[in-house]
């Protein structure tokens, strides 16, 4: 069985899962990356190790046009670049395609028209609130992308607990939504580990500092705890950065909580996981 996984870029969230597919399918697996990784995510350490099954679609990547300079997160091996005709053939002839993290529907349009099996995956439709579901223009686009395939062999892998609720609103994928997610490396710990190494009162927040992640709520929580606890028996570490980073730092200063919050900036996946293992919350 030939399986193709299409997404915007290959990163540490998908690496263990893709390694397992490559092994289980005895090499009949390909990950097709559709665009170079943004500089911000490169700084976050999202670049995954090179893998033989990763291919880069030249369709949307200026890094491979006219011999141009490669962009951050792009593959150094030019042999891994898959031209338009090649990736169209890959996507059409594969037994199964997993498609998500990419807004360009043209990658799978021919396959959808032919009625071939596709597993779409994504996070929530309405991260900023389900009130957006009333937009006529938005509903028309959701119908074109999702609802009209409700009886076709198109299934949905839900990367989040609230994803089904959003897609129920647009009457898409009835009885065809499955639990999915991001798959970090499985680690086996000895009895009691890592819980007996937790730092007392430690709280960790790790994310990009953008509006719908609400980093300001963590700072306000620190202010509330500092005001209501008899002793400051807690400390918050906020790993990450982004467009709201300076604003979040200013808020911490205004609320007088810089003594109970640490801002280490972006860290790589291994560092973030180590911090999680040490944190109580």
Please identify what each model-predicted range represents.
Residues 4, 96-98, 111-130, 157:
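Active-site proximal beta-strand in glycosyltransferases
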Residues 249-270:
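Nucleotide-activated donor-binding/catalytic signature segment of Leloir-type glycosyltransferases, i.e.
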Residues 85, 126, 135-156, 165, ...:
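Membrane-proximal helix-turn-helix segments that form the acceptor-binding/catalytic region
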Residues 162-163, 179-190, 208-210, 243, ...:
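Short beta-strand->alpha-helix junction loop in the catalytic core
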Residues 183-201, 274:
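Acidic anion/phosphate-binding donor-loop and adjacent secondary structure
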């Amino acid at each position: 069985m030939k399986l193709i996984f299409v997404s915007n870029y290959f990163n540490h969230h998908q690496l263990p899962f893709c390694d397992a597919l490559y092994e289980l399918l005895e090499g009949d697996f390909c990950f097709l990356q559709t665009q170079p990784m943004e500089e911000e995510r490169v700084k976050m350490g999202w670049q995954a190790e090179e893998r033989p099954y990763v291919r880069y679609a030249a369709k949307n990547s200026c890094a491979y046009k006219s011999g141009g300079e490669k962009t951050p997160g792009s593959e150094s091996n030019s042999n891994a670049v898959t031209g338009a005709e090649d990736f169209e053939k890959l996507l059409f002839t594969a037994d199964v395609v997993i498609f998500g993290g990419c807004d360009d529907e043209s990658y799978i349009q021919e396959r959808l028209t032919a009625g071939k099996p596709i597993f779409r995956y994504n996070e929530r439709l309405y991260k900023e609130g389900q009130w957006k579901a009333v937009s006529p223009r938005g509903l028309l686009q959701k119908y074109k992308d999702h609802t009209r395939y409700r009886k076709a062999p198109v299934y949905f892998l839900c990367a989040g607990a609230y994803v089904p609720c959003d897609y129920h609103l647009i009457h898409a994928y009835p009885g065809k939504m499955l639990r999915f997610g991001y798959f970090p490396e499985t680690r086996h710990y000895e009895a009691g580990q890592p819980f007996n190494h937790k730092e007392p009162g430690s709280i960790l927040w790790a994310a990009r500092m953008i509006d719908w992640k609400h980093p300001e709520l963590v700072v306000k929580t620190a202010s509330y705890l500092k005001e209501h606890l008899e002793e400051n028996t807690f400390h918050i570490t906020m790993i990450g950065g982004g467009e709201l980073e300076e604003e979040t730092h200013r808020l911490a200063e205004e609320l007088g909580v810089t003594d109970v919050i640490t801002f280490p900036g972006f860290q790589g996946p291994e560092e973030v996981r180590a911090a999680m293992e040490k944190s109580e919350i």
